[in-house]
Amino acid sequence: MSFRINTNIAALTSHAVGVQNNRDLSSSLEKLSSGLRINKAADDSSGMAIADSLRSQSANLGQAIRNANDAIGMVQTADKAMDEQIKILDTIKTKAVQAAQDGQTLESRRALQSDIQRLLEELDNIANTTSFNGQQMLSGSFSNKEFQIGAYSNATVKASIGSTSSDKIGHVRMETSSFSGAGMLASAAAQNLTEVGLNFKQVNGVNDYKIETVRISTSAGTGIGALSEIINRFSNTLGVRASYNVMATGGTPVQSGTVRELTINGVEIGTVNDVHKNDADGRLTNAINSVKDRTGVEASLDIQGRINLHSIDGRAISVHAASASGQVFGGGNFAGISGTQHAVIGRLTLTRTDARDIIVSGVNFSHVGFHSAQGVAEYTVNLRAVRGIFDANVASAAGANANGAQAETNSQGIGAGVTSLKGAMIVMDMADSARTQLDKIRSDMGSVQMELVTTINNISVTQVNVKAAESQIRDVDFAEESANFSKYNILAQSGSFAMAQANAVQQNVLRLLQ
């Protein structure tokens, strides 16, 4: 055993161990006071890098949730505004339905039209003023907007809201077959004219649909009335509704004279003597109407005193009489009734409540006037048109003109909006079309909102899990660290005692010098 004074190895060793114990004790106190296992890079360099990445991801996810909530707020703003617009459209249609009956006078229809115009102004006002944070929502400018809903770039949801102003919604496409003139040549006593089978092309943008063949004749259950019924039976599939107007009209007012051997649709009416000018006593119309249940044809006089024969169920109209009887009828569709029998087919109107074209082909489709070379009347209107006049083009495309005589009467159009019966029908279709368009936009917005809600739910859970993962790395385990602190505290105290003892040992050398 050796004794040295200059170098107290035991004291130095105790000091070194004590310094380390104090360092560990300070680190433990720092962790306990901050609640963090990693307070500086030296504590866990790789763990710190991972924890910092997770903290950034969690913060970004939190902002993504706020972004999604902002987007939901925008969507809900637009949705509530469109809900009000749909209520306006429902009111417009209700007023159009009210106007679509001839118990209304022109003045009462004008009052309804005035109400509708005010409603349209409010509809456009909603479209032009609805905004979120200064951005127009329903004017058509809100297109392809993106919302960041993730922690990393390009994790976005896109949203677009089409324009809901009256000039962008409520489209109605109308196509009416061409005038048939005197009509088609009637064959034999059965008055069987032709058979027609229509093929509607690219109904849904891809598929064609062919409907069953219909006989066009003067018999009951035939004609464009039967064709219209079949089309309407499958209107949901075809996307098209049909209506018809079969009418024969005199070119001039009824002339005085005698109609001999009058036959309508194969039913013999006989001779009508001493018909007065303009059929003043109703003799001619009464004779025709007395057998209307058998002929399917009803007679009336228009304001000019011209005779109109109207097919009740849409069958063709064939009129035949002895020589010179056509003059009494006033010519027009009756110009050749004393010669070879002809039939008036009438006009078929197809209506689609959107802006797409109606493409028709098929078997003998030209026989009902739907060949493009025959001058099909066609027109597309939108809801804004209700503010103006439905001109002659709209009147013809909507089927308001059954023949040339009616086209002449409606040469200036059919008036503004619901001021006419046919105009009220058009406005009803416009309101339906506009509501369908708004419902589609709202449906798309609803899908976006559901996507955003689902995203919020997902990233909220992800954010919690990311925070948990960060906590596992960065936060201190107090139970574990308390145990460490107790250990380091005891070691620090025992180290101080050991250092004191090591210094005291050197004093033993003095005993050797006594």
Swiss-Prot record:
User: A single Gene Ontology molecular function, please?
Assistant: structural molecule activity
Query: Could you tell me which Gene3D superfamilies the record lists for this protein?
Result: 3.30.70.2120, f41 fragment of flagellin, N-terminal domain (1.20.1330.10), Flagellar export chaperone, C-terminal domain (6.10.10.10)
Please provide an example of a Pfam family that matches this protein in its UniProt record: Flagellin_IN
Question: Signal peptide location in the record?
Answer: none
Localization of this protein: Secreted; Bacterial flagellum
Membrane-spanning ranges: none
Substituting residue 335 to T results in:
In strain: 85P
Its cellular-component GO annotations read: bacterial-type flagellum; extracellular region
Query: InterPro entries from the entry?
Result: Flagellin (IPR001492), Flagellin_C (IPR046358), Flagellin_C_sub2 (IPR042187), Flagellin_hook_IN_motif (IPR010810), Flagellin_N (IPR001029)
Keyword list, A-Z: Bacterial flagellum, Secreted, Virulence
Protein role: Flagellin is the subunit protein which polymerizes to form the filaments of bacterial flagella. Important for motility and virulence.
**NCBIfam families the UniProt entry points to:** PRK13588.1
According to the record's subunit comment, the protein's assembly and interactions are: Heteromer of FlaA and FlaB. FlaB is located proximal to the hook while the remainder of the filament is composed of the predominant FlaA.
UniProt record similarity statement: Belongs to the bacterial flagellin family.
Name-wise, this protein is Flagellin B
